[in-house]
Amino acid sequence: QKVGGLSTFFWQIDFPSLNFRLPFWVIWEDQIQGMLYWSTVHWSDPVRDVWTDPAFRNRYNGEGYFFYPGTEAGIAGPVASIRLKVLREGIEDLAYLKLLDQLGEREFVTTQAAKIASSWWKWNDDPQQVYLIRAALAQKIMEKQGKSEAT
């Protein structure tokens, strides 16, 4: 919940999708070695329809699951949530940050990352800014690898 009046990243359906992407920028800032999410398919009742009743413990919508049963969508197998796809984008952002660091651009990376998220309680909630910074990271990677333009 809120800590001393500060917000942090909440990972439920009801919150902006950036909440699933930006923790990886903080992971870079704090040089954390990994991230563990407690469950991706936790349904407290096996007969419950998570498509129409998404609450975990009757209050946290989408908490504990990133995959849904595909049967309701006519798919034989699991369906990935949009939250999971945004989480993947965050992991890809972290890969860009780490690659640039390995290419000798730590100062550039640190400066760019600080523009997005400098702590668990302070981040930029403008999605456009995230895309612009990611494009700048991609361009710098291409330059360092001797390629002319990022695609």
Give the residues covered by each predicted segment.
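Catalytic domains of carbohydrate-active enzymes that cleave complex glycans
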Residues: 32-33, 47-151
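Catalytic-core regions of glycoside hydrolase
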Residues: 1-48
